[in-house]
Amino acid sequence: MKKKAQIRKKMKLALKTFDFSDRQKQTQAIIDQFLISDIYQQAQAIAIFMPMSFEFDVTRLLNDTSKRIVIPKTLPQRKMIFTDYDEDALFLTPFGVRESKSDFAVIPDLIIVPGLAWTEDGYRVGYGGGYYDRYLADFTGQTASFVYDFQILPTIERNKFDIPVRHIFKV
């Protein structure tokens, strides 16, 4: 079983070098799958991460006017809240991630959880900050991830804080 640091390094490289045409095809197929899913249909407030250039492109969902779209905002002590998405009220963090200037917390019905690798049963390797696992420890709503075919691994090293994602959307 590979260590999480090795997986992070390998997957970041794989994402950065992923063929553009294949990326677009898989992204389209996965988003289409998600949009017809029950968890999407039933959710009113959906938390969507703000993708970095090599991450899964969820920006198509940011303009969904049929749902309340919220985005993560990091806080001290590796905590996180979700705030309403407003394109005109974003700033760039020192980590290169766009976040809202607002501090008004919204609890979503569904969280789209980012990551670098997953198992079939929803365990994931994130970026190592633990923000999502801390938030998900007390979260009772639905969780989902969008995963390219090469990001599924047979096993991933786990610790007691790891929270599996409930729904994996992949091609």
Residue ranges: model-predicted function:
Residues M1-K101, V106:
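N-terminal active-site beta-alpha-beta segment that forms phosphate/nucleotide-binding
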Residues K2, V106-L110, E120-Y123, R134-V171:
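Surface-exposed, charge/polar-rich loops and edge strands
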Residues F49-P51, V113-P114, S145-V147:
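Short beta-strand segments
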Residues S53, P76, A117, Y148-Q151:
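Short, glycine/serine-rich, charged loops/turns that create anion-binding
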Residues T59, D133-R134:
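Alpha-helical elements of the RecA-like P-loop NTPase motor core of helicases
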Residues N63, G126-Y131:
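Charged helix-capping and loop-helix junction motifs
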Residues I81, V113, T119:
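Anionic-ligand binding patches
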